[in-house]
């Protein structure tokens, strides 16, 4: 992947220029770092070949900066997981609330990262520039606030979230909350998993139970009981009717979702099981992590552990599989360390004897599990517990959420880059400062700059949310003459009839809106003898104000009167016609009906029939 370089930033003063009171001049901020995977994908799509022919026609990548243009996405290197290990720190993000991050999940298309924290809020981060996009209340409560679990459906149409008080909420991809199950559990919902068909989902809670919910009816079809303590993790096999759960009672249990029966129990761990995850690539493997400082990989066909992942000095708190490489596992610990394991490379420390894998043994059932050590260690990835890990769908960026309030992004190193081995995440802040690869003063200044950027991004997102949601047409948002625009940050006012309230009707100049009530028989007699009666507000034998009185017509007007001929007679006698005034009670032109100006119209082209 191609991205801007920020190496050497600690030794070169190219950060935010100092303010006047800091002894410097004011200038523009340094550009935000961007990770672009589009160019790598496009180049691979243009040069790829069938895998039996070598996969692609690009030149082999070498450790030189000139080969950055030849970087390939993980999908083009499925047989080389070592090239995908995320050893380089890309960016760190922190919310305005500065609270611990309990769960991180990439959106299905990979354009954004969704995080949930102790405040009960969802925070959305851009997946390319890593800037803040929006924040919203998700599981907020005055007594028990906090987002504890998130899960996207396989169809990418729904998101479910679990809260600290035991509630589960349904969300659309636009993060519109459409349903809430308030009494899903009696305690915090620690994990969620969808069935392969997306018709049901599984929840694990600290109330010692697991529940299978029907997504449509929002009711619990089955309650799985068998754990004796808090259930910390669960997962649903991607293709099989098989459930797995891990608990504080040190047990890993397999369940049949149809009969709610426990199939078997694994007792390999010696402390709380913190994560249980089926592999989406090799669906015969299950990975678990525990507070006993180890993680294990089980083979479902043998129903036993085949690998023990060692190396952590503190309890393992999180675990994730790579979405493309079946042999790459990443784990996070309570001391903030981030380790990456390759299942086909034991990486045994010097002085220790490597163990044989059960697959290579003539007696796999009785061969001890192979011990695997990390292929790479990021010892100081965070300063507190790493509670959640999640890979980008393309497999090139790993996101981590921690108790230290930070969300950090990690990726592979570029060709020829080795400076990352001396940064503060690998050797610590004191050692990095001693070697000159990190400056404590620059770190504080960079933190202030990032906080300012996040505040600015949040302010811009709030302005976007204040836009009117009614009927708005482009280019019709102006303030009326003499009026004052709404104070909505947009400085605009809708025109009447284009989404704004209609103006009051014009006055009727003293003409009553309706005639007084009269007996129909009497009205017919009056019309047949002396014409229509005058309104009370208009004296008889007088016209409307400003208009002359037309000569009275005796008798009843004929039904087929010619309006055009009548107009000619009035004009020949010198009687002026009032402008914009149509004589009432005139009969329509014969043989017309429809639209103005067309044959068969009931309405003439103008008020006088011309």
Swiss-Prot record:
Repeat region (WD), residues: 96-135, 142-182, 184-223, 226-265, 268-308, 311-351, 381-420
Amino acid composition bias (Polar residues), ranges on this chain: 601-610
Keywords for the protein's UniProt record, in alphabetical order: Chromosome partition, mRNA processing, Nucleus, Repeat, WD repeat
Gene Ontology biological process: chromosome segregation; co-transcriptional mRNA 3'-end processing, cleavage and polyadenylation pathway
Gene Ontology CC: one annotated term: mRNA cleavage and polyadenylation specificity factor complex
Pfam families for the chain: WD40 (PF00400)
Domain of life assignment: Eukaryota
This protein's record includes keyword Nucleus: yes
Disordered: annotated span: 1-29, 480-519, 574-610
SMART domains listed in its UniProt record: WD40 (SM00320)
Subcellular location: Nucleus
Classification via InterPro entries: Pfs2-like, WD40/YVTN_repeat-like_dom_sf, WD40_repeat_dom_sf, WD40_rpt
Chief localization: nucleus
Gene3D superfamilies: YVTN repeat-like/Quinoprotein amine dehydrogenase
Job of this protein: Required for 3'-end cleavage and polyadenylation of pre-mRNAs. Also involved in chromosome segregation where it has a role in chromosome attachment to the mitotic spindle.
Protein's name according to its UniProt entry: Polyadenylation factor subunit 2
Native source organism of the sequence: Aspergillus oryzae (strain ATCC 42149 / RIB 40) (Yellow koji mold)
Gene: pfs2
